[in-house]
Swiss-Prot record:
Its main location: cytoplasm. Pfam families: Thiolase_C, Thiolase_N. It comes from the Bacteria. Belongs to the thiolase-like superfamily. Thiolase family. Catalyzes the final step of fatty acid oxidation in which acetyl-CoA is released and the CoA ester of a fatty acid two carbons shorter is formed. It comes from Shewanella halifaxensis (strain HAW-EB4). SUPFAM superfamilies: Thiolase-like. The active site is at 99 (acyl-thioester intermediate), 392 (proton acceptor), 422 (proton acceptor). This is 3-ketoacyl-CoA thiolase. It is an enzyme of class 2 (transferase).
Length: 436
């Protein structure tokens, strides 16, 4: 059996990434305060359809993702179809794979095209850290169910008497691993200590990310892939990511205290991604259909891979496991790539993965390879800045990475690019795209 992955349909046609679009990314409780993930998803899909000048009835499937779920609208994909003027018969379902969610939605649409069941679909993801499903304590939740069953006033009074004042306090969603209780920041601290990553190196990577992102925006490179978002009640709009430190100086990073290990830590708010609101989407077609409709795709999917590791120690190593698998399936080595886009959840996590890419010992012990994945050439790495600067709406990051690397490859005359991310649950994702 060949290790090569055939990302084509039965006619041998590649899967075309026709276009990609996202909202600006905004820090929690700023420009998108009060705007749900669903509303941002509808916003970006509507604009994607408008810019593509494609009849919405041509869309055969929409797969969309969300990490911080809205209990009132659990199938965000279907709600987007119903709220954007798309044909009501358009198939739609939702996925979630933590920070790799829109990698998954993209692959799901691609695989539907590969089977020949359809030719055109939309994939993406959205998350809001400003509109959250605020819960209640377990004791109050239990009491509310009992209250619903109680018949007499006396029974209801007895239920209320079981509750203390602290039981009535709202419970925000945990930004932590369910099975371990560890937050992502605590995991990043683990990785900084395991791989001896200094505070100075973390701050330097964050400074690089913000500096490059500022240069990218100022050069107008993101104009085609970031829409202006008008926020209800439509008296204001946002047309640029608002987390980027446009006057970043390396010295300023040293002033912050560690956020997760106050005494011995090195992970700070400045070398981590903030909680972020935003949405993104890509339009996918079979190569033949794209050409028949007159589109020039921004890229084609060459290979992809998903992996999983244990969650107790250094679980944000997903790129180091998924990348070699995606490379193998593409018949490539790391040095063959033109560009590399790695999700920067934390500077510590990013640097740990970069270190393991170059480690022969890691390759032998963890991957069963006789050579390292390869040392990353920084002239190819996150050349437009990364998540540390742009921000990270969990489900939207994957399609941001894919769209961004395709457009940059296009500007450079083509080539191959890697988009890769770690994700909660010890998950990893990688996708290789080719651009003509």
């Amino acid at each position: 059996m060949s290790d090569r992955q055939q990302v084509t349909n039965a006619r041998g046609e590649r899967i075309a990434i026709v276009s990609g679009l996202r909202t600006p990314f905004a820090k929690q409780a700023t420009a998108f305060h009060g705007v749900s993930a669903l509303d941002m998803g509808k916003m970006v899909v509507n604009e994607l359809l408008s810019r593509s000048e494609l009849n919405p009835k041509e869309i055969e499937q929409l797969v969309y993702g969300q990490v911080v779920q809205m209990p009132a609208a659990p199938n965000i994909a279907r709600e987007i179809v119903l709220g954007t003027g798309m044909d009501v018969s358009t198939d739609a379902y939702s996925v979630t794979r933590a920070c790799a969610t829109s990698f998954q939605s993209t692959v799901n649409v691609a695989e539907s095209i590969m089977t020949g069941n359809m030719d055109i679909g939309i994939a993406g993801g959205a998350d809001s850290s400003s509109v959250l499903p605020i819960g209640v304590s377990k004791k109050l939740a239990h009491a509310l169910v009992d209250l619903n069953k109680a018949r007499s006033f006396g029974q209801k009074l007895a239920i209320f008497r079981r509750l203390g004042l602290k039981d009535l306090l709202p419970v925000p969603p945990a930004v932590a691993e369910y099975s371990t209780g560890l937050s992502m920041g605590q995991t990043a601290e683990q990785m900084a200590k395991t791989y001896n990553i200094s505070r100075a190196d973390q701050d330097a990577l964050a400074h690089r990310s913000h500096t490059l992102a500022t240069e990218t925006w100022n050069a107008g490179k993101l104009a085609e892939e970031v829409m202006a978002a008008h926020v209800p009640p439509y008296k204001s709009f946002i047309d640029r990511d608002n987390n980027i430190r446009e006057n970043s100086t390396l010295e300023s990073y040293a002033k912050l205290r560690p956020a997760f290990d106050r005494k011995h830590g090195s992970v700070t708010a400045a070398n981590s991604t903030p909680l972020t609101d935003g949405a993104s989407a890509v339009l996918l077609m079979s190569e033949g259909r794209a050409k028949a409709l007159g589109y020039t795709p921004i890229g084609y999917i060459k290979s992809y891979a998903f992996t999983a590791i244990d969650v107790w120690q250094d679980m944000l190593m997903g790129p180091s496991y998924a990348t070699p698998l995606a490379l193998k399936r593409a018949g490539m080595e790391l040095e063959d790539l033109t560009l590399i886009e790695m999700h920067e959840a934390f500077a510590a996590q990013t640097l740990a993965n970069m270190q393991m890419f170059a480690s022969k010992k890691f390759a032998e012990e963890k991957l069963g390879r006789n050579r390292a994945i390869g040392e990353i050439d920084m002239s190819k790495f996150n050349v437009l800045g990364g998540s540390l600067a742009y921000g990270h709406p969990f489900a939207a990051t994957g399609t941001r990475l894919v769209t961004q690397v395709c457009h940059e490859l296009k500007r450079r005359g083509g080539g191959t690019g890697l988009a890769t991310a770690c994700a909660a649950g010890g998950l990893g994702a990688a996708m290789i795209v080719e651009v003509e």
